[in-house]
């Protein structure tokens, strides 16, 4: 982060992170911003320019030598799923090691499959039945949302397994 963009009680965010990481056995980057830089990293006012905030993920900071390198587990999401966060912590406490990770340093147990693989609308995808607007007959029948911008075939998350609000729902169930 650039100076002045992230501070708490007068202390720079990088200094706070360095202090926390110094004695850590491993680091868990929780949330989209910590895991991958989130929207602050993605935002760029002009094509080809960098983020005005200088936002970086914890992994970026470790690779740049701005934070000590430790075993890193990314738990992305905005918001991340609480059961995933606690599952990673419990796994470490029970086993004394990080769980198996994918190429993006996410726990395979929770991020190994695509959202598309477990989507309740997947059969409609296979049958080539798609909603074309959020209020058409296809949407009301629960057809696949791929043509409306769904990124399920490329998204890895545990939302289809765990869901939010004690298993009550998640985006595909509510038509998003």
Task: Give the location of each predicted region.
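Iron-sulfur-associated redox domains of electron-transfer enzymes in respiratory
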Residues: 1-163, 169-171
